[in-house]
């Protein structure tokens, strides 16, 4: 089968959950003998090769561009440029493909592929990691820009397609947008260690691992750890990640007097992240917007429970079984989150053992392989 994967980023040149998903999908497809083209924006130096299995044909549909503003929000120009590049590529080569599989975001590539689908004869498969609410669109882009964004998202939903979501939250929202086609919820994005780690005695460390963008609410996490540290002797915080909110993180550490308690180490490699997850008392997820919440599963694989903040745009709460593999902080304030951290401390080894059992019991459902299998089946329907 001839498959064209469409996403403006490619792992590891850009790091994120969707990036890993499309890279894993591409490499699984070529391993199974399929012909794969990965259509993306160039993220590597001119003249260099993209870092991916050499059997995957990588095609640049646009130049190297900064995708984010200084504040951490997506720039408007790159999606437009990429959308035009996708349209031109499919206009030339669309008949070569049996399937075009794209991410819904950043929307314009999907809108570019839509009118060519009946002309070129390819099937269109779309991943919806998130479906933004009206209130979030307006907060993100303002009243006028938010309304335009909302209409663009709705137009994408009305395109005939085979859709996949990664949470019930966003599948429900997609149906409410009157999706033009079937939608399946994929539960598995985890491609790490297959055997659950034996839970070890935790150090009194709260771990935060994420790209430092406004949606992750890093200063709220610092304030919560400050309150929890007043109730848990020897508690420390470890922040792994970089991004536009780094200066705000450093300032919050000083503001709360946590210089000797909280460490911001920046980007961490896979081995460092693994070691920190294994020793942490809990993983802290203060994000107000998540399409899945893979870090919850990654922590659970090491026997580490998670504290997740409730929110109307946060699908990571679907991965938490209260008191089994973590807890949900019901309100976006330091007191509520600190209380959740204290609950994890008081649960001690019992919560680590139940987290390991939860992961073992759900591994098949949460595995990347389970989702890849369903996607491959959809290509033939």
Residues covered by each model-derived region:
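Conserved donor-binding/catalytic core segment of Leloir-type glycosyltransferases
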Residues: 164, 198-225, 238
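Carbohydrate-associated surface elements
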Residues: 169, 188-189
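Conserved acidic donor-binding segment of nucleotide-sugar-dependent glycosyltransferases
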Residues: 321-334, 342-348
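Aromatic "clamp/platform" in nucleotide-sugar-dependent glycosyltransferases that forms part
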Residues: 288
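Membrane-proximal helix-turn-helix segments that form the acceptor-binding/catalytic region
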Residues: 91, 115-119, 126, 132, ...
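Nucleotide-activated donor-binding/catalytic signature segment of Leloir-type glycosyltransferases, i.e.
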Residues: 248-268
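Short alpha-helical donor nucleotide-sugar binding micro-motif in glycosyltransferases
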Residues: 267-268, 275-280
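A charged, aromatic-enriched C-terminal amphipathic alpha-helix characteristic of glycosyltransferases
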Residues: 346-380
């Amino acid at each position: 089968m001839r498959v064209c994967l469409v996403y403006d980023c490619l792992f590891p040149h850009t790091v994120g959950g969707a990036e890993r998903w499309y890279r894993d999908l591409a490499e699984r497809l070529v391993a199974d003998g399929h012909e794969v083209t990965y259509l993306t924006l160039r993220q590597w130096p001119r003249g260099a090769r993209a870092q991916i299995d050499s059997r995957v044909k990588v095609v640049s549909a646009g130049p190297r561009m900064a995708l984010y503003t200084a504040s951490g929000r997506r720039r408007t120009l790159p999606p437009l440029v990429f959308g035009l590049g996708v349209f031109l590529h499919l206009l030339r080569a669309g008949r070569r493909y049996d399937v075009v599989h794209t991410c819904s975001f950043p929307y314009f590539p999907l809108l570019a592929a839509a009118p060519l689908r009946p002309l070129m004869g390819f099937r269109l498969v779309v991943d919806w990691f998130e479906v933004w609410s009206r209130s979030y669109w307006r907060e993100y882009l303002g009243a006028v820009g938010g309304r335009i964004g909302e209409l663009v998202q709705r137009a994408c939903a009305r395109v005939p397609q085979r859709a996949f979501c990664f949470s019930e939250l966003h599948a429900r929202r997609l149906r409410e947008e009157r999706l033009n086609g079937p939608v399946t919820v994929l539960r598995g994005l985890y491609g790490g260690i297959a055997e659950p780690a034996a839970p070890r005695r935790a150090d009194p460390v709260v771990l935060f691992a994420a790209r430092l963008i406004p949606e992750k609410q890093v200063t709220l996490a610092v304030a919560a750890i400050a309150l929890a540290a007043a109730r848990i002797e020897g508690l420390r915080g470890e922040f792994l990640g970089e991004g536009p909110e780094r200066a705000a993180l450093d300032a919050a550490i000083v503001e709360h007097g946590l210089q000797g308690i909280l460490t911001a180490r920046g980007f961490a490699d896979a081995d460092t992240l693994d070691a920190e997850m294994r020793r942490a008392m809990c993983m802290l997820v203060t994000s107000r917007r998540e399409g899945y919440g893979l870090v919850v599963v990654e922590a659970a694989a090491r026997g580490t429970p998670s504290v997740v903040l409730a929110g109307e745009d946060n699908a990571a709460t679907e991965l938490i079984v209260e008191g089994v593999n973590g807890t949900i902080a019901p309100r976006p304030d330091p007191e509520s989150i600190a209380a959740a951290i204290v609950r994890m401390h008081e649960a001690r080894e019992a919560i680590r053992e139940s987290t390991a059992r939860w992961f073992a019991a759900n591994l098949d459902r949460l595995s990347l392989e389970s989702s890849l299998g369903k996607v491959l089946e959809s290509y033939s329907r």
